[in-house]
Structure formats: C-alpha cells, structure tokens
Amino acid sequence: MSESVHTNTSLWSKGMKAVIVAQFLSAFGDNALLFATLALLKAQFYPEWSQPILQMVFVGAYILFAPFVGQVADSFAKGRVMMFANGLKLLGAASICFGINPFLGYTLVGVGAAAYSPAKYGILGELTTGSKLVKANGLMEASTIAAILLGSVAGGVLADWHVLVALAACALAYGGAVVANIYIPKLAAARPGQSWNLINMTRSFLNACTSLWRNGETRFSLVGTSLFWGAGVTLRFLLVLWVPVALGITDNATPTYLNAMVAIGIVVGAGAAAKLVTLETVSRCMPAGILIGVVVLIFSLQHELLPAYALLMLIGVLGGFFVVPLNALLQERGKKSVGAGNAIAVQNLGENSAMLLMLGIYSLAVMVGIPVVPIGIGFGALFALAITALWIWQRRH
C-alpha cells in the first residue's frame, strides 16, 4: 500500500501533491472556460439573457446529480473518480471547441464538476486525518482560489486574442488534470457494493441528508458553509451594480479586480485557519463569520476605491478563516457516519441551493427598485445575524 494511505504521512506526499495539482488545473479550466464560453456567445450573437444560463446549467447539474455523485465517490477509488470526472470536463470543453452547442458542452462540464467535488474533498480524509486534514483543506482552498484568479484572467485575455485558443487552453488544462489524477494512489473504495438502483440511491441520499442534519456538528457545518458560499456568489453580483453607484466607475474591469481582492484574502485566511484551528477548536472560526457581515455592511458605505480594495481583501481573509475548518469538520464527521463522498454531495446540494436562493432574493430586491447601497447594508447585517444565530445554536447544543 502506498505510504500516502497512512494517516501519519507527510502533508506533501506524492498522493497529496497529485490531488492539489489536479485540483488547480481542473479549477483553472472551469474558470477559464466560463469566460471563454461567454466570449463565444458574444461572437456568435447569442442574446445577452442567455449568458446567465451557463451558470444555471452548471449549478443545476450539482443539484440534479446530488443524490448519486456521493455514492459514486464512495463506491470506487476516489482518484479514479476524479480522473473520470475531469475526462467529462475535457470532453465538454473539446465539444465546444469543435462547434457543438456551447450550452450542451458546458452542461457536460457541469456534470463532471458535480461528480468531481465529492471525490476531491473526500479523498483528503483518506490521505490524511486530524489536524493535517485542516491543513490539507487549506491547501485545497488555496489552490482553488489561485486557479480562480489565474483561470479567470487567462480565459478573458486569451478570448480577446482568439476564442478558439482560449477554449483549447481550457481543454489542455483538463487534460493535465487527468494526467495528474493518474499519480494519485489507488485507495480502497470507502463503501463498495452499494445498490445502483436509482430509487434506492435517491432514498440513500435522502437518508444521508437526514443523518447529517440530525447530527449537531454536521448540521452546523452544512448551514455555515451554505451561508458562506451563497453569500459569496451574491456579493460577486452585488459588486457589478455597486461599483458605478458608489465609486462612479463604469468600466467592466473594476468589479473583476475587486472580486480578485476577495479571492486573494481567502487564500490568506485559509492558510491562517490551517495553522490556528483544529477539529477540536472549530468554534474559533465563528467570530470571523460574524465579522464578514459587519465588514460587508461597512464596505457598502464606501465611496473611495482604496478602502474598497482593503475591505474586500479583509472579507476574503475572514471568509477563508471561517469556511476551511467547517469543511474539515464535515469531512471528518461525515466520513464516519455516511461516507465522505455522500457528505460532500449533501454539502454541494446545500451550497448550490443557497446560491440559487440568495441570488433569487437579491434579484427580487433589485427588481422592485431597492438601491444597491441599502441592499448591501441589509445583506451584510442579515449575514452577520445569521452566523450569530448559528453560533448561539452551536454553543447550546
């Protein structure tokens, strides 16, 4: 058996390096492909309303396949599941390159992403445990954020040069992720021999949801991570409307740069969490979650660019410190109760449902004519109150 299977293995074992590299390339491809495909839609004169549909089919795949992907991750070696999922992403990107309908190709990438997520996080708990698991999550989040930054920029820059080159670069990134997956040790399946009857799988998934919800620690983690990622996506769209109103800047680049500050901050916060928080001290992350809402409220009142940059980076630092320990807690407790793959699949369902819900509420607020600054203030205040309520509940239970 590979040395990386043992719980006392180095955080930089061959298997862990392969996982981190594969995750970086896969996430790089995801983010570059979004901007490259948006450029393709513009070049082919698709209507503007069609652009958000790309994100909807991507998120929709997570929700639709949530009952099944966790069992897939737990029924096979997770490294091989990751390789198969990246292969689907490669096929989706290549199909767009060769002129297949971009929505169909992007849907295929979404299916691959849905299958990939439970395996990529679940395998961390098989390669390492305990305090090293929090550090491994920090590495995973840091590599993901770096890929988001570089992938987004690369997709946009290459698409301005030539859309086909940008799409080909995405396919190449996915191909590199497939190769990296080959170097992950073939670990034993966590829960082999499960039924593949779709009705039974759906029932099993619902049982996993129920089991995780009834456990105080995993429910705490599920609610916390869902609130965080739902708020993160909403903040991204909030910035697009906030920048011209608050700063008087009407270009397309400034909201992108501000979003980048959040991403950079998350890397810093994830690193701090890996050093300062363990599974036994997860509650240390809760004040950071409350402060996210407070800083968003303060940020909404700004009218200068430099303070906006600084506050958004602070939001990112707080966010990374908040979410990484919660992820690790869910993986460790979920692995023992329903399997790590099922736990992450349930988490994906919660997070993506929260994204759709929060974006829907935000869109409704904009639709009825509420100004963006009051929306930002209310958004920050509600998030701080929600995390405070979650912390109080966690302390009582």
UniProtKB/Swiss-Prot annotation:
Its main location: membrane. GO terms for cellular component: plasma membrane. It is found in: Cell inner membrane. Residues 39-52, 112-144, 188-226, 278-280, 326-343, 388-397 are cytoplasmic. One of its GO terms (molecular function) is lysophospholipid:sodium symporter activity. The chain crosses the membrane at residues 18-38, 53-73, 91-111, 145-165, 167-187, 227-247, 257-277, 281-301, 305-325, 344-364, 367-387. Residues 1-17, 74-90, 166, 248-256, 302-304, 365-366 are periplasmic. Keywords: Cell inner membrane, Cell membrane, Lipid transport, Membrane, Transmembrane, Transmembrane helix, Transport. InterPro entries: LysoPLipid__transptr_LplT, MFS, MFS_trans_sf. The keyword tRNA processing does not apply. It is a multi-pass membrane protein. Catalyzes the facilitated diffusion of 2-acyl-glycero-3-phosphoethanolamine (2-acyl-GPE) into the cell. Belongs to the major facilitator superfamily. LplT (TC 2.A.1.42) family. PANTHER family: MACROLIDE-EFFLUX PROTEIN (PTHR43266), MAJOR FACILITATOR SUPERFAMILY (MFS) PROFILE DOMAIN-CONTAINING PROTEIN (PTHR43266:SF2). This is Lysophospholipid transporter LplT.
